[in-house]
UniProtKB/Swiss-Prot annotation:
Biological function: Disease resistance (R) protein that specifically recognizes the AvrRps4 type III effector avirulence protein from Pseudomonas syringae. Resistance proteins guard the plant against pathogens that contain an appropriate avirulence protein via an indirect interaction with this avirulence protein. That triggers a defense system including the hypersensitive response, which restricts the pathogen growth. The combined presence of both regular and alternative RPS4 transcripts with truncated open reading frames (ORFs) is necessary for function.
Main enzyme class: hydrolase
Assembly notes: Interacts with EDS1.
Protein name: Disease resistance protein RPS4
Residues of the TIR domain: 14-175
SMART domains: TIR
Organism placement in taxonomy: Eukaryota, Viridiplantae, Streptophyta, Embryophyta, Tracheophyta
Source organism (scientific name): Arabidopsis thaliana
Length: 1217
């Protein structure tokens, strides 16, 4: 029915009339009479059937409902005895669906659930009254919908006079939301059933998460940015919040336009109106016509051609609706600049060629989801003290909805005022079946699909998260061709019933549950509809046996998906059970609890002479298939995917069979498989997985016909000795890992990109290896017979990863230039000279007993980021490392004595994370340890400067760590103590904005020298306290060691762990809130040693230390005057700066020590650095006078500092370091 603004009814009743739907025998002389009186006293026009002449037909009452603005539906005990009441309710439901009516349900001494679910005597009376009536289904829908609207309940304890006042208040509130009739700015379609009886203030829940959505949409409509007329599409899945967003947009933007209109519920209205009424409705609103029966569409054009208009069209569902409005939309585009049109739809294809831009409404985030759910779950009880007790359960419901606003509203509403037991029960029910109110939303979109699209949607649900190509292949081999399958996937994507992400077809969890509900309902009906059997209880417990034995039901089964992990009891199949399943397309017996599918106890017993005449089957997955071959009557003519892992098969089938559609075959760990002759005609095969087929000795020569084969996995085929000569032009990945008897590798494809030959018996690579110009990864790990790498490898210009680990006889690596080689693993080889490849980023030389030193030129490998030297037991020294090195692991280099000075070059703009590990380097000399600590100090200084300069130190993260044998905290740490806990009193303003991070140190000792660990991690819990606050402890990493590749090791010596972390968030909060205040503050630190996730009691922190690291302001004298905080105990004494570089007090001012390589300075009143005429100390001895060249450098640095040339100073400083 149309809205009242364009009604043709003459002598309309008074404006905003209220219609009361009730059972007269129950309420007319009592409650309703009082209610009518109260409404009239509040100047509200009210209509009840007493006003109609006796004998008037029911159609007159239904017309009055159409003409009304608000309906009060009063449900009482005998309501369902009256067919008139129920037919009125049906009309009320239709009008609310159209958006022309506000319904307020009143439950008179009845529970809303009794009405909604037609329970008890109320339901019995309905069933008796409606028996045999064809309208029964529509009536039930009305009972299901109307009680879900927020209404008013009157129980035995209620004071009826108070409830009457409450109803009057609700009516008055609802009336304020309905625009005056004839208003040219009216919304076409009133409040509908969305928020009847709520005040505008209560609608704030509609905006949870909507602020950002509205902002993003407004950016696309921006009138300043886009001067011309602009049409925007708002798209998203059903129930995602498009209508809410558009109403909010319309409310915000309507005042910016001289003419504006919103037409909502176009999908519903189009079912009840002729399509040519849509443009009439729109023109009527824009033309300020009270009764817009516009026959000549050109008339309004001349009136409005020079006006800017805003048009919002909500819930457009079909192309015909767009076409009906096309002329007006074209006119708007050609009219005055600045007009805006917004079209909301759940079908993106409808916006193609029409809109200038599209805004896709996304799911709500977790915070907004929780707020929206809580609002509806506690709508009348937001301050409920028990609300927190429901938080954990709330998380479960929010997770279930996955950010879907309508689902959150529905679930919250269904749980409102319910007990915790009810909440728990509801969650269990949702695991089995979704809420009917959520299903109904998706059902509308599903019903509009074609039959082919419905089948595709339900099929895709069976294979969600699979590759798009795989899904399309399954669909294409069904009733659809290849083009039709791709079209079906695109159409469902456009309608937001599925989506593609990273090449996979995905489906929202709610839609997935909806699809299963559809199949479940089909299974519970007479079996005439095709269906897919999902749940094991429906398949096993009276399901599959019953279905297989019933010819009609069996013939309509489209798919069986049985999770063997859910099967508890032994089940036996008869040899003839599959005979009647002529339409079966998908048969899948799998195990969800074991991804490898290797530990399943198969409880499905199969007879030896099983009949399997499944001509239509597309996908056959059968874990641990027990027969030696597939039955003779099995016809793979339509088979696309065959997966029989851990089977007892010796061959696929006897003889040759046509397999024109077969693209994927997986027979992994079928240990008895000895022949692949059945695949001779699989010319479209793309992937073949034969991993663990230990009996397979050879490949048939017919495999050369597989020109589309791209992936071949033969890992662990220990009996395989060779491959036939062939050219598989599409082959990209070949895996022969663990084929221990495979001796000679023939080049079977020039297009291989990934080649795994690890664990084979090959002794050399093929002579024509250079043909593999697309080869990216070559893995030859554990090829013990391999003695050399041919120089021809240097011609593989695409090679990026070369793995030669544990090639025990490999002694020489050729001098080659592989320009793109990034990863080179030579661990466990006998190579004596480290190769130098300019592009290498990851170099592993661990477990090499031959290398005694590294080439000096390693410092020039600017791309090297990871150098692994573990257990290089002959290595005695290391040279200077390149500046970009992020990880050096020298664990267990027991002969290592010296390191270069400097250890590594440091760039002035250094921001890289880096870790240098020297654990169990038991012979490391003291000078080497001092260089490591000195490097750590310089690294902290430069990181503090760089991080502050380039990102403001906004990110809290671990930037540097090192560990080495030792028993002392380095002297440059200003706070230290014995033990694992450190209490520090900090000076006022310690948290100023120059604070860049914290340096931490721990000396760790092993209490049990025989203890072996695979991981050791040192962390510090940092907590700041002052007079007003106590922050939550912040955990900072100090350092760690991990034994990669498995195994354990001893950490016998005491070790020093040093770590630098950018300013923790808790300190930054302190800094931001109190940087101008002078609050004495103390910090508490506790250092802990863990073995991964839990504390390791066999390791003890002997000593620990802390320094706060500050970055110098750019307008100060020295870019590198990185200062460290000081010990309070020494800061008030007259001290001179010794070897520890600690604080000196001069004329009452604190002096911050700078890097010792600078001249000693004092700090003036203005905080700037002044040169002090005093002999500089070095290790307690007077420093010899420097040559004039160094003095000249320092003079030049001072001049450059005055001129602000910071970078130049940094470069000089790094050179001096």
């Amino acid at each position: 029915m149309e809205t009242s603004s364009i009604s043709t009814v003459e002598d309309k009743p008074p404006q905003h009339q209220v219609f009361i739907n009730f059972r007269g025998a129950d309420l007319r002389r009592r409650f309703v009479s009082h209610l009518v009186t109260a409404l009239k006293l509040n100047n509200i026009n009210v209509f009840i059937d007493d006003y109609e002449d006796r004998g008037q037909p029911l159609d007159v009452l239904l017309k009055r409902i159409e003409e009304s603005k608000i309906v009060l539906a009063i449900f009482s005990g005998n309501y369902t005895e009256s067919v008139w009441c129920v037919r009125e309710l049906e009309k009320i439901k239709d009008c609310t669906d159209e958006g022309t009516l506000v319904a307020i349900p009143i439950f008179y001494k009845l529970e809303p659930s009794t009405v909604r679910d037609l329970k008890g005597k109320f339901g019995d009376r309905f069933r008796s009254m409606a028996k045999g009536d064809e309208r029964k289904k529509k009536w039930k829908e009305a009972f299901n919908l109307i009680p879900n609207i927020m209404g008013i309940t009157i129980d035995k304890k209620s004071v009826e006079s108070e409830k009457v006042n409450e109803i009057v208040k609700a009516v008055k509130t609802a009336l304020t939301g309905i625009p005056p009739e004839g208003s040219h700015n009216a919304v076409v379609g009133a409040l509908g059933n969305s928020n009847a009886g709520t005040s505008s203030g209560d609608k704030k829940h509609e905006t949870f998460g909507n602020e950002q959505r509205l902002k993003d949409l407004e950016e696309k409509l921006d009138r300043d940015k886009y001067k011309g007329t602009r049409i925007i599409g708002v798209v998203g899945m059903p129930g995602i919040g498009k209508t809410t967003l558009l109403k909010e947009l319309y409310k915000t933007w309507q005042g910016k336009f001289s003419r504006h209109a919103l037409i909502d519920q176009i999908r519903v209205k189009s079912k009840h109106l002729e399509l040519d009424r849509l443009p009439q409705m729109l023109l009527g609103e824009l033309s300020k016509l009270n009764n817009p029966h516009v026959d000549n569409l050109k008339d309004p054009y001349s009136q409005l051609h020079e006006r800017k208009v805003l048009v919002v069209l909500d819930d457009v569902s079909k192309r015909e609706q767009i076409d009906a409005l096309r002329e007006i939309l074209d006119w708007i585009k050609e009219g005055k600049e600045g007009s805006r049109v917004v079209i909301a739809t759940s079908d993106m294809s409808l916006t193609n060629g029409l809109v200038d831009d599209t805004y896709m409404v996304q799911n709500l985030n977790h915070r907004d989801s929780l707020q929206l759910f809580h609002y509806h779950a506690f709508i009348d009880d937001q301050a409920n003290p028990q609300k927190k007790d429901f938080m954990k359960l709330s998380e479960g419901f929010v997770h279930y909805a996955r950010g879907h606003p309508l689902a959150l509203k529905v679930l919250g509403g269904e749980l409102n005022k319910k007990s915790m037991d009810h909440w728990n029960s509801k969650m269990k029910k949702l695991a089995q079946s979704p809420s009917p109110n959520i299903v109904s939303v998706f059902q509308v979109s599903y019903d509009e699909l074609t039959t082919a699209q419905k089948d595709a949607f339900l099929d895709i649900a069976c294979f969600r998260s699979q590759d798009k190509d795989y899904v399309e292949s399954l669909l294409a081999s069904s009733d659809l061709g290849s083009a039709e399958a791709m079209s079906a996937v695109k159409s469902l994507t456009d309608k937001f019933l599925i989506n593609t992400c990273d090449g996979r077809v995905e489906m929202h969890d709610l839609l997935y549950k909806f699809s299963r509900e559809i199949d479940l309902k089909a299974s519970n009906q007479d079996g005439s509809r095709q269906r897919r059997l999902w749940l094991h209880q429906h398949i096993i417990k009276g399901g599959i046996i019953n279905v297989l034995q019933n010819k009609m039901k069996a013939a309509n089964v489209r798919g069986i998906f049985l999770d063997l992990s859910e099967v508890e009891d032994e089940t036996s199949l008869d040899r003839d059970h599959f005979i009647n399943m002529g339409n079966l397309r998908y048969l899948k017996f799998y195990n969800s609890h074991c991804p490898q599918e290797c530990k399943t106890n198969n409880k499905i017993n199969i007879p030896d002479k099983l009949k399997l005449p499944l001509k239509e089957v597309r996908c056959l997955h059968w874990l641990k298939f027990p027969l030696e071959t597939l039955p003779n009557d099995f016809n793979p003519i339509n088979l696309v995917d065959l997966k029989l892992p851990y089977s007892e098969m010796e061959q696929l089938w006897e003889g040759d069979k046509d397999t024109p559609c077969l693209r994927w075959v997986d027979l992994n760990h079928s240990s008895k498989l000895c022949s692949l002759s059945g695949l001779s005609k699989a010319e479209k095969l793309q992937r073949l997985n034969l991993e663990g087929c230990t009996t397979l000795k050879a490949f048939p020569h017919d495999m050369k016909k597989m020109k589309m084969l791209a992936f071949l996995n033969l890992k662990g085929c220990t009996s395989l000795e060779s491959l036939p000569e062939m050219n598989l032009i599409s082959l990209k990945t070949l895996t022969l890992s663990g084929c221990s008897t495979f001796k000679e590798f023939p080049l079977i494809s020039d297009n291989i990109e990934t080649l795994y030959l690890d664990g084979t018996a090959i002794s050399q690579l093929p002579m024509n290896m250079e043909k593999l110009q697309r080869l990216v990864v070559l893995n030859m790990k554990d090829c013990k017979m391999l003695e050399e790498i041919p120089g021809r490898v240097g011609e593989l210009k695409a090679l990026q990863e070369l793995i030669l680990s544990d090639c025990l006889n490999l002694k020489i690596f050729p001098e080659i230039d592989i320009s793109f080689l990034n990863i080179l693993l030579l661990d466990g080889t006998a190579i004596e000279v480290m190769p130098q490849l300019p592009s290498v980023q990851y170099l592993c030389l661990s477990r090499n007993a031959k290398i005694s030193c590294l080439p000096v030129g390693i410092s020039q490998l600017s791309q090297l980021k990871w150098l692994d030297l573990k257990y290089c037991t002959s290595l005695t020294s290391v040279p200077e490392f390149p500046p970009n090195l992020q990880c050096l692991d020298a664990h267990g280099c027991s002969s290592l004595k010296t390191v270069s000075k400097p250890l590594a070059r440091i760039m002035p703009t250094e921001q890289n994370h880096s870790t240098f590990i020297f654990t169990n380097c038991e012979n490391l000399e003291q000078a080497a340890k001092e260089e490591i600590t000195s490097y750590a100090q310089r690294k902290c200084q430069l990181l503090s400067y760089a991080r502050k300069r380039y990102n403001g130190g906004l990110v809290s993260e671990s930037l540097f760590s090192t560990c080495f044998p030792g028993c002392e905290v380095p002297s440059w740490f200003c706070h230290e103590t014995v033990g694992s806990e450190l209490e520090v009193k900090l000076l006022p303003h310690w948290h100023d904005k120059k604070l860049a991070g914290i340096a931490l140190c721990a000396v760790v000792s092993c209490l049990d020298p025989q203890d072996q660990v695979s991981r050791l991690s040192v962390t510090c819990t940092f907590k700041v306290k002052d007079e007003d606050k106590s922050w939550v402890p912040y955990t900072c990493p100090v350092g760690s060691w991990t034994r990669h590749g498995g195994g354990k090791d001893k950490i016998e010596l005491d070790h020093v762990f040093i770590g630098y972390t950018s300013c923790p968030h808790t300190i930054k909060c302190h800094e931001e809130g109190n940087s101008d205040e002078c609050n004495p503050t103390e910090a508490s630190l506790k250092f802990t040693v863990t073995g991964g996730t839990s504390e390791n009691g066999k390791y003890k922190v002997l000593k620990c230390g802390l320094s706060l690291v500050y970055a110098k302001d750019k307008d100060k004298n020295s870019a590198l005057e990185t200062k460290y905080d000081m010990l309070i105990g020494k800061s008030f004494q007259e001290t001179s700066e010794g070897v520890d570089g600690r604080v000196k007090k001069t004329k009452g001012k604190y002096v911050m020590p700078v890097e010792k390589n600078f001249q000693e300075t004092t700090e003036g009143v203005d905080g700037r650095v002044k040169k002090k005429k005093k002999t500089r100390m070095d290790n307690g001895r007077p420093k010899k006078k420097q040559r004039s060249g160094r003095d000249d450098n320092q003079t030049r640095m001072q001049v450059e500092l005055q001129e602000g040339n910071i970078n130049s100073v940094i470069m000089h400083t790094v050179k001096n370091f």
